[in-house]
């Protein structure tokens, strides 16, 4: 079993993930990452033999709009992982997202992706933070 932490409204994320094959549990709470990143969202317990991080991220970006600035900074799009072996899959998905538009800048655990597929050829910026888990505090039952 593995864990992944995603920022966003817990109720919407729980609804999106609770029926996915390979997802064993979804718990709301606060996650803190090594790069001073702190998010409010969900902890996803999943079986990597049944679902991978890319599929989890695909579902995430169907629920969370990474182009809209959240009023609460804890709800800005972010991915917090437990193991460095998860980073290649997160970066693979980021490269997939990059291929949809202009090449982004990336630095210090933050991915800034441009999506040029908009009416009028405007470029929308998508900011996704990611970092390694330091602490997770689940919501009270």
Residue ranges and their predicted role:
Residues 1-141:
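Flexible coil/turn and secondary-structure edge motifs
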